[in-house]
Amino acid sequence: MPISLPRQLALGCLLLLLGAIFIGGEQPGAGNLFSTPWDKLVHLLVFGSIGVLVALGFPTLSLSAVLLAVAAAGAVDEMHQMFLAGRQAGIDDWLADLAGGLFALPVISRLRLLYVACAVNKKAR
């Protein structure tokens, strides 16, 4: 069974975002793009977006599995930074990543309800 276009778009955006984090994070000066506390807001927004994209790309995943995926992506990102010159891993950054995943959960729930409502409405026609 082919993957629907919305899922393909979500998965494509997810891969692009993860690639931007890991490849972009290796660039000189990447660790100085955002000063404290704005860097935590960026972590929250980026990893919240990852959560939404994971949920859209894998619609059968539970919310806890989506949160676990966000936590894992954040942990891998922080571990990756341990090996980069001028970068450092931080539990505070990972907690901001996790907070982004948590804040995304109500958005994901709402998107799923809208999807079900649209599917029921389409079926009723």
Show where each model-derived region lies:
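Membrane-interface capping segments at transmembrane-helix boundaries
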Residues: 110-123
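Membrane-embedded alpha-helical segments that form the functional core of polytopic membrane enzymes
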Residues: 59-75
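Alpha-helical transmembrane segments that form the membrane-embedded catalytic/substrate-binding core
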Residues: 43, 47, 89-108
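Short glycine/proline-centered loop/turn elements that form peptide/ligand docking sites
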Residues: 2, 60-61, 91
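Structural signal for the C-terminal ends of transmembrane alpha-helices
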Residues: 54-59, 106-112
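"…centered on the first transmembrane helix and the immediately adjacent amphipathic helix/loop
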Residues: 1-54, 66, 70, 119
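Short helix-capping/hinge motifs at transmembrane helix termini and TM-loop junctions
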Residues: 25-28, 59, 85, 112
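Interfacial helix-loop-helix junctions of multi-pass membrane proteins
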Residues: 34-39, 76-98
